[in-house]
Structure formats: structure tokens, C-alpha cells
Amino acid sequence: SGLYEARLGKTEFGGETHVFSAAYRLDEFDEILNYADHIVFNTPGQVLKYGEKVKKAGKQAGLRLNPECSTQEGHAIYDPCAPGSRMGTTLPMLSEAGNFEETILPYLNGFHMHTLCEQNSDDLETTLRAAEENFGAWFSKVKWLNLGGGHHITREDYDRERLIRLVRGLREKYGVEVYLEPGEAVVLNAGFLVTSVLETMENGMQIAILDTSAACHMPDVLEMPYRPPLIGAGDAGEKPYTFRLGGPTCLSGDCI
């Protein structure tokens, strides 16, 4: 998502480094070009601002698309297709940019979409239908399509055969290379967060103070918000005891 992640990717992980940012800082862009192989832009304006630099550096440029097709329920904060989203270029935005094929497309090697979050391949299929309807006329004019992350490929109920069919279909229909970002699936259920109860108290409810923090160790719990699974636990009132779990920090809302 910018200079520091690009540097980390290139220096620590190696291989092909892709970077995306909703907008790039001018004073950082030349250094980003030293690390990134693919630079994905969020808007046509960013392509026009930096596209020539990317081309001269011998790197590849992409444009993030917003197919305006929400497949998530109840998690607008993680939905790039939510109304008012700043993530990606919509079809009306392309129309407003003028002659796309003459002014923007010559700088592009690919298109990028990231619309999923912990989802199955049926939602990817729904997204692709919308993306092809809006932008499919240009897919065969680029080298690659990056379908982003959010694919829960390692989940037991994930339909991998459908995913294979979709990827093969894109390659055959448009002659493009297809990227999938690894995302959470590569480490799904690979470990546990272990915590201990330091103290218990009561203030209108039973509260357990832990030696771990939602804000510090699991920020998605507060930002999304969501309730992470706890081994042996149940819903409120289901078990003999019901406790709220809180962290040791001074943040009042640091609760799981």
C-alpha cells in the first residue's frame, strides 16, 4: 500500500513485487519504482500523473477497477464496492476521463480488482460478471488481470473447481495472465492467539481482564467489528458463565 510495504516486499520476500495505493506521494514515487514491478493506480488521474515515469522505468502499470457489485453483507468497512467507496475506478469515472483508449490505456499493462473478503468462488463469479459487463471490452487489450485477495481458498467448503474454471475462462477468453493475491488463506487457522486471565471483576456484567489486547493484537475485532472464535466458548447465556473479555490497556473499548 505504498513505499514501505514495497520496500519490505522487495528486500525481504523477493520475487515479483506489486504495490497499490489509493494515491501516491510525488516525493516517494521514484523510490517506489526501485522496488515495485507492478504499480497499480486507483484513478485515471494517477495514471496520467505517473504513467510516463512507470513506462520509462521499464515497470508495469495497472488500474484498479470498481465493478460496483457488492457481494458482502454487513461489512461495508471492508467492501470496496460499497456506495461512496474510494477504492477503484468505476465505469462512469472512465467516461468522465475522456478518451480512455487514447489517453489512459496506452500506459496500462493490466487491470486490478479487489472486491472480496473471506469469500467463496461463487462471489468471485458474481463479481466477474459485473466486471466483464462494465470493462470487458478492454480486458483483451492488456497483459494481465489481478483479481486481488479475499479468496478463502483453503477453507473446507471453498469451491476450488469453480475458481479453476473462472481463471481458465479468463485466460482463454482474453489471452491474459491471471493473478490471485494470497491473502489470509495461506495461513488460515495456522495458529492460535494464546492469552491468560489476569483478573475478573463485575460492573453490570462479568468481566475478565486478559494479558492481550484487541486494539494491539487483533484490531479487526474493533474495526470491523467481529467476534473471533474462542475454543470451548458459546454464545452469551449458552454456558454456565458469561464474561466480557477486555484488554489491559487504557482504551475503554478494548474489548473482544
Please place each PLM-identified region on the residue numbering.
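Short, acidic Gly/Pro/Ser/Thr-rich loop/turn segments
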Residues: 68-70, 118, 152, 215-217, ...
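Glycine-rich beta-strand-to-loop/alpha-helix junction loops that act as flexible
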Residues: 115-116, 145-154, 182-185
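A structural signal for short, well-ordered beta-strand segments and their strand-loop junctions
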Residues: 62, 146, 178-180
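Charged (often Lys/Glu-rich) extended helix/loop segments that serve as interaction or gating elements
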Residues: 166, 177-256
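Active-site-proximal beta-alpha core segment in soluble small-molecule metabolic enzymes
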Residues: 1-144, 156-158, 166-169
